[in-house]
C-alpha cells in the first residue's frame, strides 16, 4: 500500500493492517514520501489513534532498518527507557538507574536520545558526564561485553529517522514516533521497563511487545503523570511475563518505600541532572540527593525484576537499595566514560 492510499483510509477512520503499515513505514523511512505526506500521515494517525497492528508494523520496520548491536546472548539483557513527554522535567531517572543495574550484575543495553520536549535527555546527560556517544555498533557491544553496560545513541542507530525529522519538528506534537523509540532497542532486548506518557498506552504497548517476542516487560505510567515509577503517587503497570499480560497498581509502600513529594527533583539542564545523580549515587549529602536516590532505587528495582535478576518487584527494590549504597553505580558510570574515551581517540584519529 502506498502512502496516498493509506491517507485515504485514515481520513475515513479506518485502521491499516500490520502489512499495510509496514509498507507505508518502509516508504517513509527510505525517503520515498514528501514531508507534506509524512506530516499528514502522522497527524491522521494521531487523530484516528494508532492500533496495535499499526504499531507492530511500524516497530518491525524500524527494527529491520536499525544499525543493530550484536551481543553474544540476550539472556537477561535489559533496558529501562521512557517515551518522555510527561512535562515533569525530572532528572534522568532511567539513565541513572541503568548504572545501578550494571553494578548489580545485570547486563544493560541502554537506548536513548537527546531531549525533545524535556530539559535533559539520556544522551545529553551522558555527554555532560564525559561519556563519548558516537560509537559504532561493534564498540557499543564491546562496552556491554566488558562493563555490563553500553549506550546506544538513537540517532546513530536509526539513521532512517532523518526522513521524518522535519515533519515531526514542524508539527510540534506527540506522534507515533514518540512511542517507537522505546520499542526499537538496537540490541533487540527482550527484558524492559518502558515508561509511557499516558496510562492508556500501557496495555497496548505491552501487547505490541508480546507480539514482537519480548519475554518480561513492565510498561508503566504513574498517577501523577510520570513515564516511570513515582515516589509521590501510585504507578499503573502492564506486565508481560510468561506470555501473559497482567495489569495492576503499585504504591511506593507496597515496595518498602515511603511516599513523598517530588519537589526538588526537576532540573533545568543536563548538568543539573548530573549533579543530582552524582549526589544520589555517591555522597547523598543533600535532601534532594537522598530523594533522588530513592527514586532511582524504585525504578532500578523494577528493572532488576524485569531482567529476572529478582523474583519480585519488592525484592528488586531491596537489591537496588543495597547496590546503590555501595557507591559502585557511580564507579560504573566513570568506567563507561573512561572506556568510551578510548573509542573517541580511535574514531577521531
UniProtKB/Swiss-Prot annotation:
Record key words, sorted: Amino-acid biosynthesis, Aromatic amino acid biosynthesis, Glycosyltransferase, Magnesium, Metal-binding, Transferase, Tryptophan biosynthesis
- Which Gene3D superfamilies does the record cross-reference, listed alphabetically? Nucleoside phosphorylase/phosphoribosyltransferase catalytic domain, Transferase, Pyrimidine Nucleoside Phosphorylase, Chain C
Q: Where does anthranilate 1 bind?
A: 82, 113
Instruction: List the molecular function annotations (GO) for this entry.
Output: anthranilate phosphoribosyltransferase activity; magnesium ion binding
> Which cellular component appears as one GO term in the record?
cytosol
Q: Where does anthranilate 2 bind?
A: 168
Query: One Pfam family of this protein, by short name?
Result: Glycos_transf_3
Q: Which residues bind 5-phospho-alpha-D-ribose 1-diphosphate?
A: 82, 85-86, 92-95, 110-118, 122
The pathway to which it is assigned is:
Amino-acid biosynthesis; L-tryptophan biosynthesis; L-tryptophan from chorismate: step 2/5
Q: How is the cofactor bound?
A: Binds 2 magnesium ions per monomer.
A Gene Ontology biological process noted in the UniProt record is: L-tryptophan biosynthetic process
Enzyme class of the recorded protein, top EC level: transferase
For this chain, the family text in UniProt reads: Belongs to the anthranilate phosphoribosyltransferase family.
Quaternary structure per UniProt?
A: Homodimer.
Record's HAMAP family?
A: TrpD (MF_00211)
The protein's name is: Anthranilate phosphoribosyltransferase
- Tell me what organism the protein belongs to: Pseudomonas putida
Gene of origin? trpD
Amino acid at each position: 500500500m502506498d502512502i496516498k492510499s493509506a491517507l485515504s483510509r485514515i481520513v475515513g477512520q479506518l485502521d491499516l493492517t500490520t502489512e499495510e503499515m509496514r509498507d507505508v513505514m518502509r516508504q517513509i523511512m527510505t525517503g520515498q514520501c514528501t514531508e507534506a505526506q509524512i506530516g499528514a500521515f502522522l497527524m491522521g494517525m494521531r487523530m484516528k489513534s494508532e492500533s496495535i497492528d499499526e504499531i507492530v508494523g511500524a516497530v518491525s520496520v524500524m527494527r529491520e532498518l536499525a544499525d543493530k548491536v550484536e551481543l553474544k546472548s540476550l539472556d537477561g539483557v535489559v533496558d529501562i527507557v521512557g517515551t518522555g513527554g510527561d512535562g515533569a522535567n525530572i532528572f534522568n531517572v532511567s539513565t541513572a538507574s541503568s548504572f545501578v543495574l550494571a553494578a548489580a550484575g545485570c547486563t544493560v543495553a541502554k537506548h536513548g536520545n537527546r531531549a525533545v520536549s524535556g530539559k535533559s535527555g539520556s544522551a545529553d546527560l551522558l555527554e555532560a558526564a564525559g561519556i563519548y556517544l558516537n560509537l559504532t555498533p561493534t564498540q557499543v557491544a564491546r562496552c556491554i561485553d566488558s562493563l555490563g553496560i553500553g549506550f546506544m545513541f538513537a540517532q546513530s542507530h536509526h539513521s532512517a529517522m532523518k526522513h521524518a525529522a522535519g515533519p515531526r519538528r514542524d508539527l510540534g506534537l506527540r506522534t507515533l514516533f514518540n512511542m517507537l523509540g522505546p520499542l526499537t532497542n538496537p540490541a533487540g532486548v527482550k527484558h524492559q521497563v518502558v515508561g509511557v506518557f499516558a496510562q492508556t498506552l500501557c496495555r497496548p504497548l505491552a501487547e505490541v511487545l508480546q507480539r514482537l517476542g519480548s519475554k518480561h516487560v513492565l510498561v508503566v505510567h504513574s498517577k501523577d503523570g510520570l513515564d516511570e515509577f513515582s515516589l509521590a503517587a501510585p504507578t499503573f503497570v502492564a506486565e508481560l511475563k510468561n506470555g501473559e499480560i497482567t495489569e495492576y497498581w503499585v504504591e511506593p509502600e507496597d515496595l518498602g518505600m515511603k511516599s513523598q513529594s517530588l519537589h526538588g527533583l526537576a532540573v533545568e539542564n543536563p548538568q543539573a541532572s548530573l549533579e543530582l545523580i552524582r549526589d544520589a549515587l555517591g555522597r547523598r549529602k543533600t535532601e534532594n540527593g537522598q530523594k533522588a536516590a530513592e527514586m532511582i532505587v524504585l525504578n532500578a528495582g523494577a528493572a532488576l525484576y524485569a531482567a529476572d535478576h529478582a523474583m519480585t518487584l519488592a525484592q528488586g527494590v531491596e537489591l537496588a537499595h543495597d547496590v546503590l549504597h555501595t557507591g559502585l553505580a557511580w564507579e560504573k558510570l566513570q568506567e563507561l566514560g573512561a572506556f568510551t574515551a578510548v573509542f573517541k581517540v580511535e574514531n577521531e584519529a
